[in-house]
Amino acid sequence: MLSRPKPGESEVDLLHFQSQFLAAGAAPAVQLVKKGNRGGGDANSDRPPLQDHRDVVMLDNLPDLPPALVPSPPKRARPSPGHCLPEDEDPEERLRRHDQHITAVLTKIIERDTSSVAVNLPVPSGVAFPAVFLRSRDTQGKSATSGKRSIFAQEIAARRIAEAKGPSVGEVVPNVGPPEGAVTCETPTPRNQGCQLPGSSHSFQGPNLVTGKGLRDQEAEQEAQTIHEENIARLQAMAPEEILQEQQRLLAQLDPSLVAFLRSHSHTQEQTGETASEEQRPGGPSANVTKEEPLMSAFASEPRKRDKLEPEAPALALPVTPQKEWLHMDTVELEKLHWTQDLPPVRRQQTQERMQARFSLQGELLAPDVDLPTHLGLHHHGEEAERAGYSLQELFHLTRSQVSQQRALALHVLAQVISRAQAGEFGDRLAGSVLSLLLDAGFLFLLRFSLDDRVDGVIATAIRALRALLVAPGDEELLDSTFSWYHGALTFPLMPSQEDKEDEDEDEECPAGKAKRKSPEEESRPPPDLARHDVIKGLLATSLLPRLRYVLEVTYPGPAVVLDILAVLIRLARHSLESATRVLECPRLIETIVREFLPTSWSPVGAGPTPSLYKVPCATAMKLLRVLASAGRNIAARLLSSFDLRSRLCRIIAEAPQELALPPEEAEMLSTEALRLWAVAASYGQGGYLYRELYPVLMRALQVVPRELSTHPPQPLSMQRIASLLTLLTQLTLAAGSTPAETISDSAEASLSATPSLVTWTQVSGLQPLVEPCLRQTLKLLSRPEMWRAVGPVPVACLLFLGAYYQAWSQQPSSCPEDWLQDMQRLSEELLLPLLSQPTLGSLWDSLRHCSLLCNPLSCVPALEAPPSLVSLGCSGGCPRLSLAGSASPFPFLTALLSLLNTLAQIHKGLCGQLAAILAAPGLQNYFLQCVAPGAAPHLTPFSAWALRHEYHLQYLALALAQKAAALQPLPATHAALYHGMALALLSRLLPGSEYLTHELLLSCVFRLEFLPERTSGGPEAADFSDQLSLGSSRVPRCGQGTLLAQACQDLPSIRNCYLTHCSPARASLLASQALHRGELQRVPTLLLPMPTEPLLPTDWPFLPLIRLYHRASDTPSGLSPTDTMGTAMRVLQWVLVLESWRPQALWAVPPAARLARLMCVFLVDSELFRESPVQHLVAALLAQLCQPQVLPNLNLDCRLPGLTSFPDLYANFLDHFEAVSFGDHLFGALVLLPLQRRFSVTLRLALFGEHVGALRALSLPLTQLPVSLECYTVPPEDNLALLQLYFRTLVTGALRPRWCPVLYAVAVAHVNSFIFSQDPQSSDEVKAARRSMLQKTWLLADEGLRQHLLHYKLPNSTLPEGFELYSQLPPLRQHYLQRLTSTVLQNGVSET
């Protein structure tokens, strides 16, 4: 016998052993047998077995236990010589089919045949879910005693016991109730035939419920037959009455649903038996059960009785007739088919009641009474099923469906609804805002949860809905189209301006402390709370950015989803610097976008839909980087240095758009966005190294511009690309002109400084000859409005480039001034002066008023769909043609033209007069007149703030040009006054980000003598003459108003310094704004402007130094320096007097009551300031202005005043100060008396006569110096009983005397006299008793003079010493009334006072 192979033997040895074994011819250790026929049977017994030579190994010592579940080793198919495999059959499949391993058997599961098994229908139930299984205490006790058995096993055992106990009842119920007396069935088996007992006419079928299932095979049938025979014997022994009685008892004990199920089960079997018996009737006997008829009738009568008690439901008109042969239609349940009947007609709305809004699948708002066909899929089984469409509540419910298609459909419809709502399609047809309703309902977080779905379709639809919610259509188009305007790259952050309620309540807290307290609180606030005030912050708090990065990086969505994600990211970046930083710092987000959507090499992409945006340059991705770079210079530097944008910019800009192997529109937009990104980086002085590399490319692009401008019609995308190219060259020219920053001591300014620019002047000096022809070519189209609007941004960018070019040229120390002066002269004579004389330019000036937001404030109404937590510009419907951002707007071109003229006039003084002739255009004059006229200011919204900023640029540049012209030659008086009024109006309107313009207006325009022509045209003299007319001969002469105005004009430089000290913006913001407007690129921190919550200066800015002086005095108990106090107060009063006299429209926004409150602050600042003679004269002149007949009716002290919490509180403080330090000062007393007029609140008079009675002795202002008429205090009669009693008490006690307080003495006497002689029958009993008592006490007064005044008062007359006239004899009515009262007093007596 050969030995087994050993471990050291090789394959050659094994082959040698095999050859020896075959040569020896020894018997093998195994026996080979033929495999039997697997499909054996009688049918195939006569066929010879197939010649299958497959060997089967039969081991002798086969173990008893089955082998372990280990996968069999892989087998190789080896066809036998006699049986070749078919060519189309897989060998592995054939091997798998013959596999006998246990694993193959276990995995091959064949269901058993259930065709002959009876199907038991589920038990009908009135509840939606099965009853919850509750373990009783008995069950728990039993389970504890009997081994460890599961709850399921115990329940099954209990059911078996219950089934075993109830066979007798089960035999009765299914065997009764046939519809007829005789029922045929199948031929009984011998076992069933033996069940008929002798001597009985009853015959029973076999058991239907007790089948023996669960017992052993040999015992199941025998046990079931035994139970059946016992049941038959028991029934035979009972009388029919006993059977019916037992039946009723069992029915009462059983569940009605179980009985109904058993009946239906029996009825089904009987129907089956009838069918079978009819087929076998010729050869089969019939079984008669005529004696069971009473039993059947008892069962059948009960449902009939029940049917009589219950009213019949109306028959449903089904669209089709159900057939019994249909699946599950053997028993028709009409209530479940109720939904298939026709819908009722739509109810017509008879009232104006609000109804729930319903929308179509395209988001359209459906009318309440619209009748649509059902095949549109707009009807459902909810409330108001006859109405088509889905409500928002139903759509929300559908988003929680388990079916992904339904979730996607609901999100799609909601996205369509949002898009249409933002487009303004719903208008006023809906009550309230759809966006606000959705946000309040939690739609934001519904979208966020949908982004975490596992289905790509749901994710795509959720992203689409998120874009529809966040990205307002039209906003990005507006900002892109105005990128090349004057400072068009600067934008306001799109974030809510409202603060938390706690911050609003703590406005007095210092900003540093507020910031320290706010940041940890904001970090701990949950996302829903954040989203209630700011949607973007709430979204960022939910880890939105990592999820969007995952979708882009892992799921590889389609082009639409990619564009939606990029649009959402752009909206997040526009929110604030913080949001842009979070987008930049999200791990792998920007890396994925740059790698996948901004590659340096790609396959050519043809026109038409793109299957995928991956590895293809995308203009939207480039725009995202541009928006991120606009948020701050640090972000721009990180983008350029960390993501290899240099190679990508070079790759895209180096080729013309036609050569980028992309669709034409995408190539144009991609090239435009690349140029804009470079321009933004150049705005910080970065990216200069690219200019040296791409200089030939830029020169070639500039040379092609005239040919592109000559195409008809001009392509809008090409015009935007050309404008972006010129904007880039403008920034590079400014970078070349900027000088290295000097050593700066201020840390705020040092932080803005950077390394010098890498672009030199010699590299940009050759650009002007290429740009100027482009400007000339576009200006020829000015007379053709359609062509002019098509090339709109190009001439604007050309003008801005020329301004930057000459500004940088004049700053070069190595250049000769004569060269650039001669070039400016040439440009002015050849281009600008002919342009200024063109009539078409005058039409542009005339259209300013029609496109102005200031002249049309109603055109900027907040959008209906503008929730405060989600800010947008609201340009969904597009801008009208005649609007500031419309296609026919003259603002961008005229602003750029004024910018160039200002630059030339600043450098070349000799051109100033010629260029300033543009200011005499009638359209500009009319525009200024309408802007200066008093009127309602536009409501400050995100769009109005953006539009007003551009409008203010034009106004400032026009005023700057006028100021330069006025410094060289006098302006016409009317023009100078108009420019000054425009400067004053603009100063109070400038928004954050224009701090430099505010400072320049204060420095050069507002306090310029040339803008006050009244000083040389008789203005002071006219004021003196007006004083003489108003004073009259009876008034005491004082310092003339004309003298004060002349002195103010002389002190104008000091006044300017005072306001520059107190009204200049913060230094850091001023430096940032200055760097932007001066082109100092190395100091520009960001292109994102501050939040436009309110204008930089308040409307009452002329009083601002005085208000700050008052607050400093309140915070400094020791007092302020007399010199500073006197100087500041005097300069403010002088300037306010100038405005009140010559520019009253400048103070139109400040109510007279607010001006009075500011004048009171002069007396509250210091105890000695009001005694100074200049202050006395100025306050007296301003008080006279407030008391003019045309101003006094507008004095309202009861309304809310800006900057003042409560006027009564201020007046109480004023009375305290007057009582302490006035010493009877007449001017002080006049200010105390002015709020005591009868038409003002009684609270002010009660404060004086109730709490400050001692001040009455110091109010010695003569009647002749009272600034208003005495009738203002006496008419109408006083009706406040408490005040009348105070009047009477002060008169009787002597606290109010004519020599101490002549004015209020006359007032008190007048009101008391009117009260005691009043005979109003509608007066209350309390008033009548007080009147009678006061008259009685007056009659008994010991002071004869006071008694005479109170009883004989007639009319007020300030010319008399007493201030009123007296009756020589009382009128008869008063005399009779007094006599009747005094007779009653003499009879009854009166108590002493």
Swiss-Prot record:
Where composition is biased (Pro residues), the residues are 64-74
Keywords of this protein's UniProt record, alphabetized? Answer: DNA-binding, DNA-directed RNA polymerase, Nucleotidyltransferase, Nucleus, Phosphoprotein, Transcription, Transferase
Residues carrying Phosphoserine: 72, 1121
Q: Which domain of life is it from?
A: Eukaryota
Entries under Pfam families matching the protein? RPAP1_C, RPAP1_N
**What family does this belong to?**
Belongs to the RPAP1 family.
Instruction: Indicate the quaternary assembly.
Output: Part of an RNA polymerase II complex that contains POLR2A, POLR2B, POLR2C, POLR2D, POLR2E, POLR2F, POLR2G, POLR2H, POLR2I, POLR2J, POLR2K, POLR2L, RPAP1, FCP1 plus the general transcription factors TFIIB and TFIIF.
* Protein name (database record): RNA polymerase II-associated protein 1
